[in-house]
């Protein structure tokens, strides 16, 4: 690992990407809730909220997490997750890059193709880094959670320029469209806030990487 990548800033960046990835990867369960509401997590949320662009969405996430004080509340949030990200309908916001980047128009009633070009590209990126999608996560490699987890990895092990190019070519070119879809169809507050925070974070990180790469 180079001196450029092995520093506290990149470790912190990697942690944030990994957190965002984990929340898109699966429903919030009791274990995750405990981790997200621990004393250490509260300090993390407070620090993240110091950035004006993040504060509103962080405040919503913290408030919504505080409401998850029963099995029923967790089940309701899990239902929101399922309806948004696991069911491919007009009222969902499928978290796959290929659905937002495909050049082929999808006819009404047709199912967009998964495991397509973006999936193949991400699979190749993972192989190059000697990584793979975990077997218990049976999703295409262009799932947002996989892409965010990969950025968490390269934040630790590659140059700022390489990170900049990957984020620009594989994340920011579709993330805003996905977030707009979440905002349109989500009836709750948690996943809208999560999506908007993710977009704000990625855009902020891209600006930082750009300034670091040109300085």
UniProtKB/Swiss-Prot annotation:
Its main location: cytoplasm. It is found in: Cytoplasm. The lineage of its organism: Bacteria, Pseudomonadati, Pseudomonadota, Gammaproteobacteria, Alteromonadales. One of its GO terms (biological process) is protein complex oligomerization. The keyword Cell inner membrane does not apply. HAMAP family: TorD. It comes from the Bacteria. It comes from Shewanella piezotolerans (strain WP3 / JCM 13877). GO terms for cellular component: cytoplasm. The gene is torD. Gene3D superfamilies: 1.20.120.1820, HscB, C-terminal domain. Keywords: Chaperone, Cytoplasm. This is Chaperone protein TorD. InterPro entries: Chaperone_TorD (IPR023069), DMSO/NO3_reduct_chaperone (IPR020945), HscB_C_sf (IPR036386), TorD-like_sf (IPR036411), TorD/DmsD_chaperones (IPR050289). Belongs to the TorD/DmsD family. TorD subfamily. PANTHER family: CHAPERONE PROTEIN TORD (PTHR34227:SF11), CHAPERONE PROTEIN YCDY (PTHR34227). Pfam families: Nitrate_red_del (PF02613). Involved in the biogenesis of TorA. Acts on TorA before the insertion of the molybdenum cofactor and, as a result, probably favors a conformation of the apoenzyme that is competent for acquiring the cofactor.
């Amino acid at each position: 690992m180079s001196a450029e990548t092995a520093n506290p800033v990149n470790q912190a960046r990697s942690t944030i990407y990994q957190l965002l990835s984990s929340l898109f990867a699966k429903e919030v369960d009791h274990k995750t809730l405990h981790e997200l509401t621990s004393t250490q997590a509260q300090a993390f949320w407070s620090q993240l909220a110091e950035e004006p662009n993040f504060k509103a969405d962080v405040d919503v996430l913290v408030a919504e997490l505080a409401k998850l004080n029963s099995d029923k509340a967790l089940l309701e949030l899990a239902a929101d997750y399922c309806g948004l990200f696991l069911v491919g309908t007009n009222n969902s916001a499928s978290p796959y890059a290929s659905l937002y980047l495909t050049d082929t128009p999808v006819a009404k009633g047709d199912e967009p193709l998964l495991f397509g070009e973006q999936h193949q590209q991400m699979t190749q990126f993972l192989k190059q880094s000697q990584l793979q999608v975990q077997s218990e996560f049976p999703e295409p490699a262009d799932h947002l959670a996989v892409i965010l987890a990969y950025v968490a990895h390269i934040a630790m092990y590659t140059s700022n320029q390489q990170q900049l190019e990957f984020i620009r070519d594989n994340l920011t070119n579709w993330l805003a469209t996905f977030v707009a879809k979440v905002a349109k169809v989500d009836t709750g507050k948690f996943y809208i806030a999560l999506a908007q925070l993710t977009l704000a974070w990625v855009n902020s990180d891209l600006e930082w990487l750009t300034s670091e790469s040109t300085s």
